[in-house]
């Protein structure tokens, strides 16, 4: 088994010359390699809808973790329910932070997402994912190279130093248009916020719509020197 510790033995390669640009091959390998010791960390963005559909074809009872920060858009929570109805066999876990919002405010002050967004992300996303990955060998992410400068060198299989894990990214070669083409082709549910200028959807407090021609991550932590929550630093 390929693990964080045995990374030097990595000789896995995949062709992107197929209908899913390698995504199904990568997922098939991942579930064969890690069996029950792999989880998909899903934010329920539009890429997530594609991955859930593909994962359901490979492993209908796969584990899916949603990092419920308690400050997501209502539309996101409603979408999760639609996904549960569409893919009833998937094991969707809504992972809660250790601190409630009130407890966080008592310790660190109100609106931590404004005063210290890095700490807020650590408490409400990074630490919960660390807990979720504690007993896993690998995790799946919907990163695409096209999304931003910080993601353009992502590979199908990555040694993840942040979580000392293997990060599997099946959609790295997909374009924004290809993602949407797949969603429409398979009549997949998606977050209606995408239709009103939100290409990337995170917490309600830290996500704004993006103007025409903007980077897909421009609406995240707008006005701050921050483009990532910290889950995907290598």
Curated annotation (Swiss-Prot):
Provide the species name: Bacillus cereus (strain ATCC 10987 / NRS 248)
Q: How is its cofactor bound, per UniProt?
A: Binds 1 [4Fe-4S] cluster per subunit.
Catalytic activity, as annotated: [thioredoxin]-disulfide + sulfite + AMP + 2 H(+) = adenosine 5'-phosphosulfate + [thioredoxin]-dithiol
- Could you list this entry's UniProt keywords, alphabetically sorted: Cytoplasm, Iron, Iron-sulfur, Metal-binding, Oxidoreductase
Its Enzyme Commission number(s) read 1.8.4.10
Superkingdom in the source lineage: Bacteria
Family stated for the protein in its record: Belongs to the PAPS reductase family. CysH subfamily.
What biological-process GO terms show up in the record?
Answer: cysteine biosynthetic process; hydrogen sulfide biosynthetic process; sulfate assimilation, phosphoadenylyl sulfate reduction by phosphoadenylyl-sulfate reductase (thioredoxin)
Transmembrane is among the record's keywords: no
Which Gene3D superfamilies does this one have? Answer: HUPs (3.40.50.620)
One Pfam family, please name it. Answer: PAPS_reduct
User: What's its job?
Assistant: Catalyzes the formation of sulfite from adenosine 5'-phosphosulfate (APS) using thioredoxin as an electron donor.
Q: Which residues form the active site?
A: 229
Annotated Gene Ontology cellular components are: cytoplasm
Q: What is its subcellular localisation? A: Cytoplasm
The protein depicted here goes by the name Adenosine 5'-phosphosulfate reductase
Q: Which cofactor does it need?
A: [4Fe-4S] cluster
Q: In which pathway does it act?
A: Sulfur metabolism; hydrogen sulfide biosynthesis; sulfite from sulfate
| CDD domains attached to this UniProt entry | PAPS_reductase (cd23945)
Query: GO molecular function: any one?
Result: adenylyl-sulfate reductase (thioredoxin) activity
């Amino acid at each position: 088994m390929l693990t964080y510790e045995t990374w030097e033995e990595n000789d896995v390669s995949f062709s992107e010359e197929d209908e899913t640009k390698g995504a199904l091959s990568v997922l098939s390998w991942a579930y064969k390699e890690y069996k029950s010791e792999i989880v998909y960390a899903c934010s329920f963005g539009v890429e997530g809808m594609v991955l859930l559909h593909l994962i359901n074809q490979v492993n209908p009872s796969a584990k899916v973790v949603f990092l419920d920060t308690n400050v997501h858009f209502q539309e996101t929570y409603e979408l999760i329910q639609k996904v549960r109805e569409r893919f009833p066999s998937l094991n969707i876990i809504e992972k809660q932070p250790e601190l409630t919002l009130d407890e966080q405010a008592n310790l660190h002050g109100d609106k931590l997402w404004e005063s210290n967004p890095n700490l807020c992300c650590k408490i409400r996303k990074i630490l919960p994912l660390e807990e979720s990955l504690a007993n896993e060998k690998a995790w799946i992410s919907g990163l695409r190279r096209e999304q931003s400068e910080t993601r353009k060198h992502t590979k199908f299989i990555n040694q993840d130093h942040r979580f000392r894990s293997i990060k599997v990214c099946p959609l790295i070669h997909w374009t924004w248009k290809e993602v949407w083409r797949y969603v429409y082709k398979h009549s997949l549910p998606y977050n209606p916020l995408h239709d009103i200028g939100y290409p990337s959807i995170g917490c309600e407090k830290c996500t704004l719509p993006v103007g025409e021609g903007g980077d897909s991550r421009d609406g995240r932590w707008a006005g701050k020197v921050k483009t990532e929550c910290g889950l995907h630093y290598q």
